Amino acid sequence: MGSDTIADIITSIRNADMYRKSVVRVASTNISQSIVKILLREGFIENVRKHRENNKSFLVLTLRHRRNRKRTYRNLLNLKRISRPGLRIYSNYQRIPRILGGMGIVILSTSQGIMTDREARLERIGGEILCYIW
């Protein structure tokens, strides 16, 4: 775990999906809870539960996988960190990119909290582009 909690969450989920793990454990922070809530609402993960161990809180995520698949495995989740500590990327609501023509989502940090691109366009507010998920 480094100092960039968003990158840690994205990397943990991406690695677990790549190796077909069904459960991921990430550190519980306000930002991670907001991002996980969006992933759960959009259907990218199945379940979330809180776990406490040695006075540290964790979120235990259950990933969504295709079961009984015989062919080669393709990742179901594609996550990409955009704005990072060394290079912040901001966008107004008109220039928020559309991922796969609206099939994917963009997670933004706005003055109203962390939200998806669709919510930001409806609210007509921009913000920092945290990551793409498709």
Swiss-Prot record:
GO molecular function: rRNA binding; structural constituent of ribosome
Domain of life of the source: Eukaryota
A biological process from GO: translation
Classification via InterPro entries: Ribosomal_uS8, Ribosomal_uS8_CS, Ribosomal_uS8_sf
This protein's record includes keyword Ion transport: no
GO cellular component: chloroplast; ribonucleoprotein complex; ribosome
Keywords (A to Z) from UniProt: Chloroplast, Plastid, Ribonucleoprotein, Ribosomal protein, RNA-binding, rRNA-binding
Disulfide bonds: none
Function of the protein: One of the primary rRNA binding proteins, it binds directly to 16S rRNA central domain where it helps coordinate assembly of the platform of the 30S subunit.
Summary of subunit composition and partner proteins: Part of the 30S ribosomal subunit.
PANTHER family reported for this sequence: 40S RIBOSOMAL PROTEIN S15A
UniProt family annotation: Belongs to the universal ribosomal protein uS8 family.
NCBIfam families, alphabetized: PRK00136.1
Name assigned to this protein: Small ribosomal subunit protein uS8c
Species the sequence originates in: Lactuca sativa
